[in-house]
Each structure stands twice: as structure tokens, then as C-alpha cells.
Amino acid sequence: TMAGNIFNVLIVHPALPAPSVKALIALARARPGELNYGSSGTGAADHLSAELFQVMTKTKMVHVPYKGGPLAMIDLISGNLQLMFSTVPTAVGLIKGGKVRAMAITNSIRYPLMPELPTVAEAGIPGFAVNNWTGVFVPAATPPAVVTRLNAEFVKVLAMPEVKKRLIDNGIAAVSNTPQQFAAYIRDET
């Protein structure tokens, strides 16, 4: 069962002279190879988000991989990095505190607790969408009746208003689907 979609955000150092995604693209094109971005490691979702951004915008920036997102975030706050992609839960306190500036949500929909923040697609890169998700798995040999029961219980829990609120407050939109839908989604994405 898919349990939720995790919201991600493009964030920049507050001093970066680009007030919008379009301005960031223009700056990166004007200064190829001069802007840098951090990631939690080579091949991680935030790294791949930045690579997709570069491909879709025909820009070139320097990748600075770290051994974890918190180390990259420290360098973004200190100004050693210009930008990075992050999960909303990791970045929201820093955004609210003015330590970093949010430019856009990478998901295909806006984050409900920051409705003023456009998606990257809305901000100037049509078709850009990076959606991370979380789900519940069981061993392949689990009896179908057990899978059905577990799914029903997870769907009930995910439908509870207090659970939905707790998830969205932490940057996750609750999703309830069937095991078959989840399996099809995974097949389609891989």
C-alpha cells in the first residue's frame, strides 16, 4: 500500500540574486558551471532532481555531493552552496526562519501548507515533477487474506483526520490505494 507522497522543495541561499525559478534559470545560463548545488549524495533523489532540472533547463551547475542532507544544508545556510533540492520536512523550519529561500515545490501539486509556493512546472519548467513516496511492503509469500486485511487497516488509519493532519504537517500527503494499484505504480515507475 502506498502510504504517502513526500513533498520536496527547491531552496536557495537568501543572497542568491534570483527571485524566481525563471530568474534562477537565466542566472545559471548566464554563468554556466559557476553555480553549485548540494545533495545528500551521488544518485540520491535530491541529486537526481537537480540533474533533471539541468537537463530540462539546458543549464550546467556544479554538483557537490555530501554524506547526508544535513551536511549539505549547513553549507547552503552558510553560503557555500547556492541551491539544493530537499524534502519539505527538512527545510520548512529553515524557510520560515529565513535561513533559506523556497523557490518551488518539485511535486506535481502544491504543498497545502505553503499554497503560495508554485510547483517547478508552474514556475517555468513545464513537465517537471519529482514525487517521492513511501509505502508499506510485506514479504512476497504473505497470504492474500493477510495482505487484504493489512491494506484495509492501513487505509482506515490513513483516512483518519488526525493522521492526515500529522502527515501533511510533516510534508507528506496521505495516499490510500490497493496492493494491486501500488504494484502497478511501482512497475510503471521502474
Enumerate the predicted regions with their spans:
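Conserved, function-defining micro-sites of small-solute handling proteins
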Residues: 1-190
